[in-house]
Curated annotation (Swiss-Prot):
Name under which the protein is recorded: Probable malate:quinone oxidoreductase
UniProt key word Magnesium: no
GO MF annotation, one: L-malate dehydrogenase (quinone) activity
Pfam families membership: Mqo
EC id: 1.1.5.4
Taxonomic source organism: Xylella fastidiosa (strain M12)
Reaction(s) catalysed by this chain's protein: (S)-malate + a quinone = a quinol + oxaloacetate
Amino acid sequence: MKKSLKGLTGLIVAFALATLLFLYWPLYQRSVPKANNDTPVDVVLIGGGIMSVTLGTYLQELQPDWKIELFERLNGIAQESSDGWNNAGTGHSAFAELNYTPELQDGTIEIKRAIKIAEQFEISREFWSHQVRHGRLPAPTEFINATPHMSFVWGEDRIEYLRKRHNALIKNPLFYGMQFSTDPAVIQQWAPLLMEGRTQDQKVAATYMPLGTDVNFGVITRDLAKHLQDSQNFALHLDHEVTALRQNPDKTWNVTVKDLNNGQERSIKSRFVFIGAGGAALKLLQLSGIPESKDYAGFPVGGQFLSFENTAITKRHNVKAYGMAESGSPPMSVPHLDARKLDGKSIVLFGPFALYSTKFLKNGSWFDLYSSVNHHNAAGMLSVGKNNIDLVKYLMKQATLTDADRHAELLKYFPNAKPTDWTLVTAGQRVQIIKRDPEKGMILQFGTEIVMDKDHTLATLLGASPGASTSPSIMLDLLAKAFPQQMKNGWETQLKKIIPSYGQHINDSPALTNKIRRMTSETLSLPYLEVPDKSATPTDPTIAPKHQHSTTHNANSEMQAL
């Protein structure tokens, strides 16, 4: 008995010591090669996704003499979450995403978040339009297509919520043209697959916004990266993994990279480093050792969709129809039936279904989550898990789903669907931010966030949705934070040529909304609606023809969707 007790005690002590060693093991102290460049490059971009490439595109136009180097671990650009198959492709404008417009306790609808996101997407349209005009992006139909956005609900409470949401939004110029209906015949005209086979006694409602879009962020990222390489001041390094980050006494950074083809390491000195590595950004932030990194952790969640490629189905669904999450469900559970343009053909995707994984990237390691845990964030992560038990239960339930379970969910939005119509596809990984709040301690943070060191020499983008849709706006914020002096000394003037609405709120003025949307609609071959001087409830607004190019009730209180 005593021997058993001693043995058990020994195991407990050994486990405790191993845990302490694991949590306190240094993240960033190891021997690395010295930098092989005495004169530092101006910017190092880590990660070949849309964020790094968008920032590089801005910088190349604002400061063409700067030397920029981009390092990507995989053998191509936009292979992770920026790839068309790895995200929902929604041009997030808050037209359809109900979780951006929560119902408050007094019954009113909060629309500030929706307006902000809608304005951010208009900035994206301006940025992409500028790139098209300068030949840095291909014909617009290769990366953005008019795809109406719908919200679709059933049940009296949710119908009333959607009615109030519609009434609140259409008073704003950016949402002019959104239609609302409870008439099954009208909704069937908008989206036949949603209504066919549905019982006649089920009360439904929908909103329909003709200005919605479907976006292929992979095409945008790859084409912008291609044109970045036209400059002799830009260098792209594929199959190169960043393994260490060290700040020098002069505030420059030594970025150590491993060539995955031969295993050799080298270091590059840089004045500024941007970590835009998607899910891997957290671990790289921790490698930097900056004090700000101690306030963050991450929780990975994968996504899966049901994919339809049969033209008999895809030709009859040309909208993105967003539903409402079940009560108590987390944001990644918001269901949507999406029309997509991928690999040159029409696709319909339904989902997402959460996929539990400890990977931070689709092509990552199963040890990603564990290697990000340390003595700064371990207790906080456990606390977040305890305080978000609904999320834990949801993920456990999703892990046990069968194909029959997924099909049952599908039938709520596509009543006539057959199991033989679809295949299950795995999308990209997302890493939800766990952040230290001064008052609440560690909390689950939704959205994206820029983390920057006090010297403004290293910046990291953490988080997820709306993400790629608002990448030009997010990178504008980063430019202002990281390069305040350059902004004052001429960049702001140049930015107004790239983003004509820069420094203004588009939603504040029908005239500005019309000016910007008319310009971007013409350049991007998208439909256009003229907003009256005094925006009011529209009555069958007329859509201008597309320009032809020559070539509570809120069942999801967290403000985010996958």
